[in-house]
Amino acid sequence: MPDFYFPVRRRPGIMSVGRERARGKGINAMKTKITVIGAGNVGSTIAFMMSVKHTADEVVLIDINESKALGEAMDIRQGAPLAAQPVSVYAGSYRDAAGSDIVIITSGIPRKPGQTRMDLAQTNVNVLKEIAPEITKYAPEATYVIVSNPVDVLTYAFHRVTDIPAERIIGSGTLLDTSRLRSRLAEYLNVSEKNVHAYVFGEHGDTAFIPWSIAQV
């Protein structure tokens, strides 16, 4: 059996990918551990980019669909030999989040055509309420990054339903909007995105706005 298959004994059916490496066996002890909750398009992409850029030494993927999390972790793990510094990526349970430095929450019901982010508010707040007590029990010292939509509402809701200090709860906010704006301006002006300094402020949604007076190229 290949060395990256390691069953998680606590919960039959979940298999860890690279678990022995994550525990530091045979290599130096790992430094940074990040847990991603939600193995959908956003969560799996985040895990992949962290692996490619070596943002973390250990990445845990958690999803209600255990097979999905396992499949995504395996795909990332099997491409690891191509990276300069392979990262240990594996699927696990909330218990496996213990010791995480950062927890990124991407879980939630995706928007349907014609639906606004705010239409999802109550549905995804309920999802968050199920996740919050489980993850904070095992990773009480982590910094939490909320990505699920509506991100502003869910970031506030996470603060209200947990004991995590506000300074350790971060919402992705308009970061993606700002990135899209800079990319579009760079394309339109035929310049490098690194030379575009413009921002999107406000809510990540219909009320977001661009303060053009401070935009620079």
Where are these predicted regions, by residue range?
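N-terminal Rossmann-fold NAD(P) dinucleotide-binding loop
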Residues: G43-S44
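N-terminal Rossmann-like NAD(P) cofactor-binding module of classical short-chain dehydrogenase/reductase
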Residues: D101-I104
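Conserved N-terminal Rossmann-fold NAD(P) cofactor-binding segment
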Residues: I62-G99, Q115
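Mobile gating loops/cap/lid regions near enzyme active sites that modulate substrate access
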Residues: S183-V217
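Short, Lys/Arg-enriched N-terminal segments with co-localized hydrophobic residues
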Residues: I14-A29
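Rossmann-like NAD(P)(H) cofactor-binding subdomain of soluble oxidoreductases
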Residues: T116-R182
